[in-house]
């Protein structure tokens, strides 16, 4: 709309559209935004070439001409009405009346402007050639700016869609075509038929009257909001004039339709107004023909009502209930030709149905849920149900479907988390053995890995891949590779058990070391498995393995040999970690062994009864594995009892008191302990110490005495740090000498037990020395260091007396 002059002969006002935003740099410049319509007041501004004087929203100023586009007037332009009229006044003109052009279809040929409101609006009487103006609150005002000479703005009032009245001129209005459902009978309706849309109160009366007396076919009606928008008619190029159903209103209000007529009369079928491809779903009954004839003959308005988005169909007695995969989309079930599709409410979720196929492959949790709900599958309460959905239950089913989808996803995630958690728990193994047995196991498995790798490397030479050499040794190489794989697997199982035991430690540094070394061994074992698997698949074929020249890249056999060459070093490093930290790793095992032994002592029968039971027992001969496991448990108990002699001393007076109170026990010797005390062992047999061991014991005692004297004399940290290092070094040499010289198993267990305790005291001494140096001259730190020195000296002398 352009702001032109309203008087004939007046100069035309030029309008321009802003192409870009403009910000005023001075007071004379006019600021505007892109898309604004400016009124050009003067194009030739003196001393301002390229600038126009323009007007925008009552503000006048200079605007750059290169940012404006002049709007040219076209012949189709018409002047705006001068003054707004009231709703009751008529506007007469000698010429043709003002008409609103329709974008979809040409305007009607009649002399009167007939606007379409909502669906159809009746025209004004033919004799009164007036332009109907609605009330000002519901009108849309379009304001056109005028020049400064016309300060008042002209208002053009356009009508908004209002509720239509009954038509009086059928030949001069749009006719609304009947919605096509594929029935030939509906095509015989009158071409010019008008539909009135009743209000919500009228609709309630219509539904009640329909359900009580009349046999009227239900056709779609919808509760439109007053003042709501509408979709235009379908394009006139279509061969069949089918009125398009408003999409937004259909989705919003389709659930508000009453279901009274559906539940009362099951004999009459509703014409589904929302689906145009409902093939074969509803047959044309005789009632429909009568109803259509009644529509054409009766002067009454035809009544139409929408069915709900889900047609309630009677369920079979043995029909299976399936949850549709796309139940959230409105009217999906009407487009589906399969019967018996029901949504499952939330409350029935605990009862089993035939689960949909899309749900069966979601996750393992879905299968577990299915198996858990198989018992009440054929419940008569479900199979005998005949449901008629109400709008409330329909909305509830949609809400329950959302919650059901979220519940299924959460159940699957929970079950996957629990399964992964259980698998991780199963993978973590802990070794319940004493320190000595763990060290022996680690050393023996390490020797096995080293010997098997050495046996394989015996065949590796400069010419071992030649045909003659490989043909001779191929079977031996294969057996050696099997031994390497088996030995590494056994050590890896033991290492994983140590890693599980290390999870109970508080030393994060030790846990990280064990975890990293275990990961290295696991990677090497996986490489061995992959290479050996490839060799087994080719059956160790000579044609594949024989080569007479140097290879640039490693094949499977070379990769296996290279990995077997480095595995013993990784295994040795892990074994050293276990030996050095065995007391920390398996300390809790000894404590549990002490508690188990304490319980055994309380309930152990006399020795004679035990011997007689063993003689009469038919299970005297046990497998070798059970015997070895029992022997390992006894060794653990022995070591733990040696480490806790005070537990023995506490148990002796208890047994003596019981024997004194009960005279029947006087003729019976008390049950012997599992192992005698170290002093008792010394009376029977002494361990012969070598010359080197004796020298190291003497050096240790001397270093400890010098260290203690320096502490008592108040020497500076530079002095007692050196003496502390000397004590620790001599102690480590002593432990290494004792462990290497002792070969017998019983003596070795005893020496390893005392040596591990000695190593622990040496570690405590190192920590106390570090603390004393940092806090020097703190008396508390020095006193703690002196107490550690005294403990070390006491245990060393006791250990020496125990051995010899």
UniProtKB/Swiss-Prot annotation:
Residues 369-395, 607-628, 642-686 are annotated as: Disordered. The modification Phosphoserine is found at residues 200, 297. InterPro entries: CAS_C (IPR021901), CAS_fam (IPR037362), CASS4_SH3 (IPR035744), Serine_rich_dom (IPR014928), Serine_rich_sf (IPR038319), SH3-like_dom_sf (IPR036028), SH3_domain (IPR001452). Residues 380-390 have a biased composition (Polar residues). This is Cas scaffolding protein family member 4. Pfam families: CAS_C (PF12026), Serine_rich (PF08824), SH3_9 (PF14604). One of its GO terms (molecular function) is protein tyrosine kinase binding. The keyword Signal does not apply. GO terms for cellular component: cytoplasm; cytoskeleton; focal adhesion. The gene is Cass4. SUPFAM superfamilies: SH3-domain. Belongs to the CAS family. Residues 11-73 form the SH3 domain. Phosphorylated on tyrosines by SRC. Docking protein that plays a role in tyrosine kinase-based signaling related to cell adhesion and cell spreading. Regulates PTK2/FAK1 activity, focal adhesion integrity, and cell spreading. SMART domains: SH3. Coiled coil: none annotated. It comes from the Eukaryota. Interacts (via SH3 domain) with PTK2/FAK1 (via C-terminus). One of its GO terms (biological process) is positive regulation of phosphatidylinositol 3-kinase/protein kinase B signal transduction. It is found in: Cytoplasm, Cytoskeleton; Cell junction, Focal adhesion. Keywords: Cell adhesion, Cell junction, Cytoplasm, Cytoskeleton, Phosphoprotein, SH3 domain. It comes from Mus musculus. The keyword Aminoacyl-tRNA synthetase does not apply. Residues 649-664 have a biased composition (Basic and acidic residues).
